[in-house]
Amino acid sequence: SKRRTAQMQAITATIQKEQNQVIRHADAPTLLVNGIAGSGKTSVLMQRIAYLFYQQRESLDPSEVFLITPNPVFERYIEGVLPDLGERNPECLTWDEFLRGLMPPERSGGQAPASLDAFERIDEACATFSFDQHDFKEIHCNGERLVTVGQILQVAAKFRNIPAGPHLVTLMREELLRRLDSRLKQLAASDKVLDEISMLTLDQQVELFRETFDPHDESQVREVAQQYVDLRFADARRAVENDDWLRIDRIGMRLLGVENLVPVEWLYLKMALTGLGNADAKYVMIDEVQDYTVAQLAVLARYFKRAHFLLLGDQNQAIAPGTATFDQVRALFREVRGPLEECRLMTSYRSTPEITQLFASLLDDDERLSISSIQRADTAPEIIACASEQDYDRELRRVLAQAVGDDGLTAVVVPQKHQAKLLRKKLGDAAPALIDAAATLPASGVVLVPLKLAKGLEFDHVIVPDASERAFPDDPLSRRRLYTTVSRATRGITLLAQGEITPLLAARA
């Protein structure tokens, strides 16, 4: 009908206006995008990156743009999207990949929380800190001790009038590299190294030097020997350049009075002491910003010291305890980056109006009244409260059997992985396949998915097998988990409970 067409045109114009507000936003130190479920945040992110590349096509290199995402699958996804938009890919990292690139393998694992208080104590302590002999460690490589603690202490004494911090560590690093070069020259002139070179087979020569050699005079012999030791002890040079001669753990324990540093504390301390960071990055995009802790965001803000930040997320999809609230995100980036600008995306093009209305009912009045959907009306959400366990079991099996015959893909979404295992045990042969992080979703059928994996995905239908108060009590975290669960559905949703439905939805039951 003409009226429907006019409505669609008006809604489409609203979406374009909302999204263009982000895509074409003037450059800002920090741009925070708070978008409801299904509002096209991923699309906006891709188009924003493409827009920046186009705007700065003469000066912006993909290596200067970083995308931090909690989802490792996202990297594969953007490999196809940005080239289609005519652009090369930015650097794409998960938090774990970011840590692994900067920390020793034995230190980079784990998600132990840290507070900004610890960072403030590190900053305060570094202002008056002095190294002692226990803060240093030797550099060994291929059986050779190349930098000793005694040498590091000599270098520290040379610069004793300079306070601890990036300037001092830079001076010490440069002096240690000079001493390492001197040590490698001595090794290159040693009989031991000359004997090792003379014993190399042709295959070993090619493996090391990518060519064979046959030196004819002493200068050529010295040149080959220097190349040999430089290659053989390249890891030692990297260790000095990376400040691996500092015992960050030991320094941190002394500064903070703790027995062990969590990974983000370790990394923050190394940044504070050495100036570790990326000064070349121009833009950093953090997707699903509500999934990060304040400490993680503080580390990213300090590491990418000169970059402008685009922060995308949905404050109502913070489904893990301890992550940053949007108020905390605003406060942090205003403190470290200055003015912060914000855009809202309030129109859903993923879910039907009925589903959109259901997850919007979980929000505050102001937010709920601003949300709309562009999809056609479809079936109303089905909310089933069963009086007995027998009734519940029968209804659950009926709903699952019906879903098997439906078109599209149905997800049975549970809050935690252990609940998925309990449900599979209860249903036996009728249980859907449990999806894990490595699995590829089928195009149709029924799958069982923990909420953590379902987040960021969409399904034609969603079944919530336990929407009781036990699973979703009336508290802010459960409210966000239910909002996230419901908003995975595009066309239909069924919620079941043995006993009363969660009070979060009681008015709709």
Residue ranges of predicted features:
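Hydrophobic anchor at the beta1->P-loop junction of P-loop NTPases
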Residues: 33-35
